[in-house]
Amino acid sequence: MKLAHLSLFLLALHLSSSRSPSASDLPQEELVDQKCLLQKYTHRSCNKVFCQPWQRCIEGTCICKLPYQCPRAGTPVCAMNGRSYPTYCHQKSFECLHPEIKFSHNGTCAAEGKFNVSLIYGRTKTEGLVQVKLVDQDERMFICKNSWSMAEANVACVDLGFPLGVRDIQGSFNISGNLHINDTECLHVHCRGVETSLAECAFTKRRTELSNGLAGVVCYKQDADFPTSLSFQCVNGKHIPQEKACNGVNDCGDQSDELCCKGCRGNASLCKSGVCIPDQYKCNGEVDCITGEDESRCEEDRQQNIPKGLARSAQGEAEIETEETEMLTPGMDNERKRIKSLLPKLSCGVKRNTHTRRKRVIGGKPANVGDYPWQVAIKDGQRITCGGIYIGGCWILTAAHCVRPSRAHSYQVWTALLDWLKPNSQLGIQTVKRVIVHEKYNGATFQNDIALIEMKMHTGKKECELPNSVPACVPWSPYLFQPNDRCIISGWGRGKDNQKVYSLRWGEVDLIGNCSQFYPDRYYEKEMQCAGTRDGSIDACKGDSGGPLVCEDINNVTYVWGIVSWGENCGKPEFPGVYTRVANYFDWISYHVGRSLVSQHNV
């Protein structure tokens, strides 16, 4: 029986260690993660994407900020209702709450005329060549076809009142024989795709010999198509060809075709979080993958002369032109990025001093000063009974089974401790103000095994001072780390052969996927995380409870991914350790400690 259990464990590790496949590795129907699709993620799902700067993340969804929550720095903008707003963020926040109030133009509302987009030469109201009239321009102008992609077409259709966006950009239109137009007279437009009006996009009048016609669009109506076995159903109800899913192009309009991918086709790259982004988003100065890899190693790539983000892709992205003339409107994308840069920034997960990374040693190794500055010990009476994790301010994260609210007065939090028989000079001792145990904690099943400890501030102080501690970051998304990622556990728990351990020790473990096969009827995947090694030599044990399972992202920022919770037969390979999955409790944590203390993004 044990042999079978061990075989299951090794198989799980093997499956976890398989590399992320490219689109060429997978049949077309297997590019999409069907289990992920059940979550119905869209461009408003902050488990998968960053919220816009006029939104904030609440319970996994990007919701509208109130205008006063926007940064004040910026220049005025005018909306289609003729009202001026202090900044672009204020207008977009107001529009988020009142979608009919769209952006018109930069500056005050003194300019003559309004921005307008219309369709002409279509056989129905849903299609035609696209014409725009810019503010302070006297005439309507067509859009050049070679600057037209799904990004621009989706924005145009939404602007025209078709919330599901575009159906096709290759329509056949009844163009009048009286239409005499030189291609050089059309406008080039560039949108990112998150805009709600073409007025927010950049318009340029260019002289070009590369134009191959005028841009047209067929907008999507709710009853436009019936689902087939070869269609992909978007979360918004739209149906697109299956081969358009996971290609880095937002064909759905709500991005749901790009958020649950195992690989990407075409000119797209796969984020570790299962999101396909266009190749030109890599190394463009803005982080698009929530896991950050699209902006890592950029300097190295530049040194190897690998151009990224310089030209737009074949899915309708603009060709490099030989001659340019005037910029008519600059677009608001740079302003969106600037607003993002003004949002509050949180410092966490970065050690003050850097030690040389040591190779993994079987059985773990003693830690040095500053190695794990978020690790704390919880002392109850005369004994250190559990570990904990400092997350900032006066707050410690630990396991619910470690503490009781009624005993808060008897606990002490020891910070920067290395050896509890030989206290080091950096040691700090904090008393406890209160203990908050998750209201749905179940001591029999270890569900919701999470608690918060609030430390007392010293007399006359307005905040807790822990000079030798650094908070670990709190993860907001369950997709920041994946099975087979190598992470670190630390603590003062029992060692080999149940020996007492007095010095802080650490060890590397691999995250494991669903552990229901090892712990039938006891493992709850949403709330729990398994981790271990092939030989069981690194494991959390008695006394480590409440301590950290931390993972580093690609930028070496440390997140508390798990809290030591439970397991069986410490150090046995067929019994991996089970940890409370912290990302599942981000909103619970932020509710008690305050969002500003733990929110890195989407604030």
From Swiss-Prot:
Entries under Pfam families matching the protein: CFAI_FIMAC_N, Kazal_CFAI, Ldl_recept_a, SRCR, Trypsin
One GO biological process term: proteolysis
Tissue-by-tissue expression: Expressed in the liver by hepatocytes. Also present in other cells such as monocytes, fibroblasts or keratinocytes.
Binding locations of Ca(2+) 2: Y281, N284, E286, D288, D294, E295
Keywords noted in UniProt: Calcium, Cleavage on pair of basic residues, Complement pathway, Disulfide bond, Glycoprotein, Hydrolase, Immunity, Innate immunity, Metal-binding, Protease, Repeat, Secreted, Serine protease, Signal
Source superkingdom: Eukaryota
Gene Ontology MF term list: metal ion binding; serine-type endopeptidase activity
SS bond partners: C36-C260, C46-C57, C51-C62, C64-C96, C70-C89, C78-C109, C144-C186, C157-C219, C191-C201, C234-C252, C246-C261, C264-C276, C271-C289, C283-C298, C348-C473, C386-C402, C394-C464, C487-C551, C515-C530, C541-C570
Protein name: Complement factor I
